[in-house]
Regions:
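Sec-dependent, cleavable N-terminal signal peptides
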Residues: 1-2, 573
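Substrate-binding/charge-relay-adjacent region of secreted/lumenal peptidase catalytic domains
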Residues: 2-93, 101, 106-366, 391, ...
Length: 573
C-alpha cells in the first residue's frame, strides 16, 4: 500500500538536548526499535466512564480493561499494514497498553515517519536524535497517538543522593545518623504482624542491576529470613546488569529493592529492567501495570525528569498508562525529585518532576528526621541546598488540578500564565542523605537518601495495608485526600522548611504534600473507609431500537372544534 499524504503528529515536536551538538550521520542499516501508541477503542462517553470509574476507586480486571479500553484489532491491523509497507517488523502487540512495538533499519524508520535521524553528542555521551515533528500518513490520523523511541536520549534520572560521608571519603563509611529501613518503618509506626505476604511489589529500573549476594548480606544483617524473593523481568531487551559503580544506577536498584523488601519481606518483588528512553520507560510501566503473570498490586518508580524535558505525546502516553494502572487497582508510588522547586532546570522558573506530576501517581516528597529513641522528635522539609539536594515539589504546568485536590489549597503556578495545576507531592517520608538509609551495593555498605527512598518505603507500607485489607488500596489519591487524611493522626503534617520557592505549612504543601505516614493509624483509616470490593459491571450493551408503533388512523372531527395532536414519544430513550 502506498502512503502519499502525511500529517504532523500532534505533540511529537522534539529539540536536541540542552548543550547537544550534531555529531554526524547514522548508519542507515542500524537496527532500531520504536513504540507506536494507539487510540483507545473507547471514545466519548466510554472514555468518560473510565475517568469516573478511576475517580471512584473502582477496579477492573486486566482482561476487562483490555476489552473495554484497549486498542481495537482493526487499528492494530492498520499499523501492521503500514509497517509492512515500509519494511518494518512487528515485534510485539500489547492491546491492553494500546502499543505496537516495531523493529527495523534506521533508514526505513526515517522514511516511514518522515524524520531526519542523526547522531548527537552531549557532555561526552552520544544518542540518536531527531528534531521537529514526527509525521504519519493521513490514513492513520487519529489512530496513532504517539511514536516513541526514534530518539533514544536518556529520558530520566534516578532520584537518589549518597550521604556526604561516602562522597568525601571511601565507600564503606556509614553516615553518623543513617538508619536501617526497619528503624525508619518503626519510627513511622508501620503496622506490625504483617509481612506483605500474598502481595507483589513491582519496581521499575532504567539501568544497573542487583546481585543475590548483596541481597543475602543486606537482609541477613537485618535478621530477615527467608530473604525476600526478587525476580528480574526484561523489557525491550534490557537486563539485570550490575555496573559495579556505586555512584551509578546499581545504587538506585539496590535502594529500591532493599527498602521495599525490608518493610514488606513477605511480598514478592518483581524488578522490570528497561532502557532509559521515553519508549523503554513507557513500555516498562505498561508491562508492569498489565502483567497478568506477576500481577503487582503496587509499583515503585524512583526515576523521572522535569515536565519541560518531555514531549507532549510522551506526557499524554505516560499519563494514560498510569491511568490504566489505576483502573486495574495498582498504586504507583513515584519519587518527586531531588532538586527542589526548580527540579534542576536553570531557567529561573519552577518545575515539577514527571511522571510524579501525573494525577494518577502517588507522588512522594522528602523530609529530614530527628529520632529520640525510636520515635521521631522532629521532622522538617528536606533541603540541603543546591549542592546537597532538596525535595521536589510544586505545581504542574501540564496537568490541571484534579478533583481530589479541589480543597487542598493548591496555589496557582508561579510561572507565567499562573496555570492552576496538579500539586506535587501527595505524601512524603525521610529522604535526607544525612538521615539516610543503610544499603548494601556492589559489596559495599553506605548510606543513601533522596526521594528515591520514599517511593519504595510507601510501596512497602501499602503492600502491608493490602495484605491486611485483603484487597489492594488501588488508586489511593481520591480516598487519601477526601477521607483518609481528614482522620486525626493518619499523617504527620510537616510545617517547617522549604524546597526553594515553596514553604511548608499546615495541611497540604508543595514540599511534603499531606505529610509523612503514621502507618498503623493510616491502615485503620483505610480499613474504615474501604468499601466492599465492587462487582465488575459488564460492558455496556447498545440499547435496542424501539419498534415503531403503528400510527392510529386520525379521527375526523367537526371543523368547528379544535384538533389536538398527541405528541409521540417515538424515538426517545
Amino acid at each position: 500500500m502506498a502512503y502519499e499524504k502525511y500529517v504532523k503528529l500532534p505533540g511529537s515536536e522534539r529539540q536536541p538536548m540542552p548543550g547537544a551538538t550534531q555529531a554526524g550521520s547514522l548508519d542507515p542499516n542500524q537496527l532500531m526499535q520504536v513504540t507506536v501508541g494507539l487510540r483507545s477503542r473507547a471514545a466519548g462517553s466510554k472514555q468518560t466512564s473510565l475517568d469516573k470509574l478511576v475517580s471512584r476507586g473502582e477496579r477492573l480486571s486486566r482482561d476487562e480493561y483490555e476489552a473495554r479500553y484497549g486498542a481495537s484489532p482493526a487499528d492494530v491491523q492498520q499499523v501492521e499494514i503500514f509497517a509492512s509497507a515500509h519494511g518494518l517488523a512487528v515485534a510485539q502487540v500489547n492491546p491492553a497498553a494500546r502499543t505496537v512495538i516495531l523493529t527495523g533499519r534506521c533508514e526505513n524508520f526515517a522514511k516511514a515517519f518522515q524524520v531526519q535521524l542523526a547522531r548527537y553528542e552531549c557532555e561526552g555521551s552520544f544518542y540518536r536524535g531527531r528534531t521537529g515533528y514526527v509525521s504519519i500518513p493521513t490514513e492513520l490520523r487519529g489512530i496513532i497517538t504517539s511514536v516513541l523511541g526514534l530518539d533514544n536520549r536518556p529520558q530520566a534520572q534516578a532520584h537518589f543522593r549518597i550521604a556526604a560521608a561516602v562522597n568525601s571519603a571511601s565507600v564503606g563509611a556509614l553516615a553518623a545518623t543513617s538508619f536501617t529501613a526497619l528503624q525508619i518503618a518503626k519510627a513511622y509506626n508501620f503496622p506490625t504482624g504483617l509481612t506483605g505476604k500474598g502481595q507483589t511489589i513491582g519496581i521499575i529500573e532504567l539501568g544497573g542491576g542487583f546481585t543475590q549476594s548483596d541481597l543475602n548480606t543486606y537482609f541477613s544483617g537485618l535478621k530477615i529470613s527467608p530473604v525476600p524473593t526478587v525476580v528480574a523481568v526484561s523489557v525491550d531487551g534490557a537486563q539485570n546488569q550490575p555496573t559495579g559503580d556505586t555512584n551509578g544506577p546499581d545504587t538506585e536498584v539496590m535502594l529500591d529493592i532493599e527498602v521495599a523488601g525490608a518493610v514488606a519481606p513477605g511480598a514478592r518483588i518483581v524488578v522490570y529492567f528497561a532502557p532509559n528512553t521515553d519508549a523503554g520507560f513507557l513500555d516498562a510501566i505498561n508491562q508492569a501495570a498489565m502483567d497478568k503473570v506477576n500481577s503487582p498490586s503496587v509499583i515503585s518508580i524512583s526515576w523521572g525528569g522535569p515536565e519541560s524535558s518531555w514531549t507532549a505525546q510522551s506526557l499524554q502516553s505516560f499519563n494514560s498508562a498510569l491511568q490504566a494502572a489505576a483502573a486495574v487497582g495498582v498504586t504507583v508510588c513515584l519519587a518527586a525529585g531531588d532538586n527542589g522547586s526548580s527540579d534542576g532546570v536553570s531557567d529561573g522558573l519552577d518545575h515539577v518532576d514527571f511522571p510524579a506530576s501525573s494525577p494518577f501517581s502517588l507522588a512522594c516528597g522528602g523530609t529530614s528526621i530527628t529520632l529520640s529513641g525510636s520515635s521521631i522528635s522532629k521532622e522538617v522539609v528536606w533541603n540541603d541546598g543546591a549542592s546537597g539536594g532538596a525535595t521536589g515539589g510544586g505545581v504542574s504546568d501540564t496537568f490541571p488540578i484534579p478533583a481530589f485536590q479541589a480543597n487542598a489549597n493548591v496555589p496557582p503556578s508561579r510561572n507565567p500564565g499562573n496555570f492552576k495545576g496538579r500539586g506535587v507531592p501527595d505524601v512524603s517520608g525521610d529522604a535526607d542523605p544525612a538521615t539516610g538509609y543503610d544499603v548494601q551495593v556492589d559489596g559495599s555498605s553506605f548510606a543513601v537518601g533522596g526521594t528515591s527512598a520514599v517511593a519504595p518505603l510507601w510501596a512497602g507500607l501499602l503492600a502491608l495495608c493490602n495484605q491486611s485489607l485483603g484487597k489492594p488500596v488501588g488508586y489511593l489519591n481520591p480516598n487519601l485526600y477526601q477521607s483518609v487524611a481528614t482522620k486525626t493522626g493518619t499523617l504527620h503534617d510537616i510545617t517547617s522548611g522549604n524546597n526553594g520557592d515553596f514553604k511548608a505549612g499546615p495541611g497540604w504543601d508543595a514540599c511534603t504534600g499531606l505529610g509523612s505516614p503514621n502507618g498503623a493509624t493510616l491502615l485503620q483509616a483505610l480499613s474504615a473507609s474501604a468499601s466492599p470490593t465492587p462487582t465488575p459491571t459488564p460492558a455496556p450493551k447498545p440499547k435496542p431500537k424501539p419498534k415503531p408503533k403503528p400510527k392510529p388512523k386520525p379521527k375526523v372531527k367537526p371543523k368547528s372544534k379544535a384538533t389536538k395532536t398527541k405528541r409521540s414519544n417515538h424515538g426517545k430513550r
